[in-house]
Swiss-Prot record:
Positions that bind substrate: L141, V142, S143, G144, G145, D174, G187, N288
Organism expressing this protein natively: Rhizobium rhizogenes (strain K84 / ATCC BAA-868) (Agrobacterium radiobacter)
Catalysed transformations (reactions): L-threonylcarbamoyladenylate + adenosine(37) in tRNA = N(6)-L-threonylcarbamoyladenosine(37) in tRNA + AMP + H(+)
Record GO biological process: tRNA threonylcarbamoyladenosine modification
Protein name: tRNA N6-adenosine threonylcarbamoyltransferase
Amino acid sequence: MASFLRILGIETSCDETAAAIVERQDDGTAIVRSDVVLSQLDEHSAYGGVVPEIAARAHVEALDTLIDEALKRANVSLADVDAIAATSGPGLIGGLLVGLMTGKAISKATGKPLYAINHLEGHALTARLTDGLAFPYLMLLVSGGHTQLILVRGVGQYERWGTTIDDALGEAFDKTAKLLGLPYPGGPAVEAAAKKGNPDRFDLPRPLVGETRLDFSFSGLKTAVRLAATTIAPVSEQDIADICASFQKAVSRTLKDRIGRGLQRFKSEFPKTAEKPALVVAGGVAANLELRRTLQELCDLNGFRFIAPPLSLCTDNAVMIAWAGLERMATGAAPDGLDVQPRSRWPLDQKAETLLGHGKRGAKA
């Protein structure tokens, strides 16, 4: 009998098409046999953001080829995989349909079970793949579509402690870049400009700092950036750098307050964890070095491990989707039927209060 489970992962929730082959050993460790990702950056850059119809068509054109490439790199065939895991939400509905329907077709043709995976669960469980992290732990998800602080108790057991009430952090970066005439994607552009700027020139707001609830807000910060740029227009290259540096400083101070309160709550609820408590960061914004420095310092101050998976596993990828499927299989969870439907909105915490917050992919929960 095989001492491992092998799964094909498929990810098409936004503007990356991805496929991967991942194995889970009996001892819970993972082996990534292949990881193939095709970015649609060139297709969307002219529009300053992701265009859903263009994204869906690009997934249709690329996915079959990427799955073949993932199998080839892993030196396996579909007959050698034990199951298929495909993202079924949240995200852009057109892209989700492409990936999930492909997963269904493979499941039907091969008789292999299908697992419809929540994209956010993929992010939530990635640290167990990379670092063998034990439950429970905290995760900060920061991307173009999400800003959430989540308690991860176990596979399928998630509590949302905080979320954005308006813009997601990645969206705030992108909109700030657009306001200042910087290229898409905005996150890297703002970070690069900030390195040449004075973070103390503009006193930008730090939304919700001091409040006991753990939610986030970035819409007002984005508005303050616009007002600052308008006041000194026309802006020079140095002005742009100073605004970006001031923006990043405001974001860092905001996160320091919000996450710091979350770490204290975790310690009060779990005073005797077997291992050193951990904060995991995931999502494309996790690539920002200033953000990482802030979170590392915060964790050091509070006695937490800070875990930031490799960038390739922070942004959208199929490895995390495959791994989430393997984690579910290991718990004995039943596969999904072929009648499972994609969901543009699918909160991890089904009991959490619905808020008005939304990012690029629509309201989140």
